[in-house]
């Protein structure tokens, strides 16, 4: 099984042959909104700082995110990554599900597991955090997304 790991948590042991995108170590440029990924070079961002990640993500069977919560929401680094994943989708939208969604560019996307850590101001804030992530991956045409606190990963020993 090919796995890609996206992490902003330092305490996770990840096997050596897994592609790792360390959001704490890698400087990722914000999306410029230039639309090059849709018009000039379809499917390819004008910035090249994530080319290796894009390839690994699209070739993976599973993408595992180890993330932190910041002020009851995802970090700015993770939000930037989500924004920069738009080249994986077509500029056209569909109303097939009763809501506007970009069409997939590729036939297959990896399953996703998200393990998060951080304190929340309330249980409803934690629930909203999980719902936001579920919606992101739904919009990304991810067929299977699991979202759990980091303790869920440590307890179930997910095979990477």
Residue ranges and their predicted role:
Residues 6-10, 117-120, 150-152:
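Structural motif
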Residues 85-100, 141-147:
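Short, acidic/small-residue loops that bind anionic groups at enzyme active sites
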Residues 1-63, 67-90, 138, 155-158:
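N-terminal beta1-alpha1-beta2 submodule of the flavodoxin-like/Rossmannoid cofactor-binding fold
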Residues 69-71, 118-123:
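Short histidine/acidic/glycine/proline-rich micro-motifs that form metal-
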Residues 49-52, 98-102:
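A generic local structural motif
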Residues 121-160:
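Glycine-rich phosphate/pyrophosphate-binding loop and the adjoining helix
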Residues 102-110:
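Short, conserved loop/helix-junction motifs that constitute active-site signature segments
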């Amino acid at each position: 099984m090919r796995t890609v790991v996206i992490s902003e948590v330092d305490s996770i042991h990840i096997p050596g042959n897994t592609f790792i995108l360390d959001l704490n170590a890698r400087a990722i440029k914000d999306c410029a909104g230039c639309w090059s990924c849709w018009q000039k070079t379809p499917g390819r961002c004008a910035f090249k700082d994530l080319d290796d990640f894009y390839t690994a993500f699209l070739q993976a069977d599973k993408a595992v995110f180890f993330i932190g919560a910041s002020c009851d929401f995802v970090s700015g680094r993770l939000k930037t990554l989500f924004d920069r994943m738009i080249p994986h989708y077509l500029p056209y939208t569909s109303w097939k599900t009763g809501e506007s969604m970009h069409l997939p560019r590729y036939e297959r996307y990896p399953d996703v597991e998200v393990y998060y850590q951080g304190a929340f101001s309330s249980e409803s804030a934690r629930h909203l955090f999980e719902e936001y992530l579920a919606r992101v991956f739904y919009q990304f045409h991810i067929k299977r997304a699991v979202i759990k606190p980091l303790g869920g990963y440590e307890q179930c020993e997910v095979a990477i």
